[in-house]
Every structure is written in structure tokens, then in C-alpha cells.
Amino acid sequence: MNLQHHFLIAMPALQDSVFKRSVVYICEHNEDGAMGLIINKPMDQFSVENVLEKLKIDPTPRDPAIRLDKPVFIGGPLADDRGFILHTPCSDFGSSISISEDTMITTSKDVLETLGTLKQPKNTLVALGYSAWENGQLEEELLENAWLTTPADKDILFHTPIAERWRAAARKLGIDIHNISTEAGHA
């Protein structure tokens, strides 16, 4: 089972403060474990513009039609000082890795320098921190019914309103997440 380019959808019973009602986009899943970013937990009062100001990045030439007041997401509980940018394909950046045909991840500063300009990727999601699982850990959590999985959808990733992403991801499975019992059982 390879869950790269899939969503993990937190089950209602998962009450961990970081992962409660979360949708995690899995960027990498292999024999070493898994790595992903939470895509529906924005940081309080912290925007892409704030990140650029803090890093003293002034993208030029600035296109005022491109909004920089988009939220920065809490990617996960690990390394919350590290930035990750999910974006639609663009080959101009130093450390971009293709996750799927329509999604890449970049960790280099050069992508930040394009935000707010016509050179930026068409769609972007900026996160600080990440989520990770050791080899076998995610599979164990799936067996414990902590998560649902579904192939990722770029519309949910980049266009669905943040507050609706958890329900929208579950709807891809034909599920109303609010109707799922928090109790596991056997038929």
C-alpha cells in the first residue's frame, strides 16, 4: 500500500489536539515511513505575507491582483520552524519534488520569492511543520480506525474552503463524516 498523494481523513474518534478533524496530504510514503502536511488547520493570524515579511523577502515585480493574505497552515507537530510549499507544477525551483502529475512540494526559498508575482505557481499552499510516521506506524493507525484514506484531489487541496475540507475529503468516499460512529465493532 502506497498512500503518496492521498488524503488521511481523521476519524471523529481521533481526539488528538493536532489531528482532530484534520486532513493530511501525504507527500511521501515508502518503506521508511510517511510524511505529510495538514491542509485544514490554518495558523492563527499568520499569513503568507507575514512569512515573507519575517524572512525579509520582497517579491518583485509585485502583482497586486495576487493576494498574499492567504493563511499559513500548521503542517504538523514536527519542525514547526521549517516551511513547505505545496504547489501546482513549476520547474523553476531548486528543491522541488514531484508528488503527482498535478502537485509538487518545494522547501527552498526561491519559491517564496515568486509569491505575489506572475512567476508564482498557479496554486500554492504554505505550511510550517510537518507530520511523520515511522515504518509501519501509519499502517497500524489505519488498522486502529484512526484514519480514512482517499486519493488526493487538487480542488480540495487548493480551492475548497478550509472549514469544509474535512467533510469534502470524506464525501469523496461517499461518507458524511458526521454520521460515522466513534465506536469500533464487529459485525
UniProtKB/Swiss-Prot annotation:
SUPFAM superfamilies: VC0467-like. GO terms for cellular component: cytosol. It comes from the Bacteria. InterPro entries: AlgH-like. Belongs to the UPF0301 (AlgH) family. This is UPF0301 protein ECA3925. The lineage of its organism: Bacteria, Pseudomonadati, Pseudomonadota, Gammaproteobacteria, Enterobacterales.
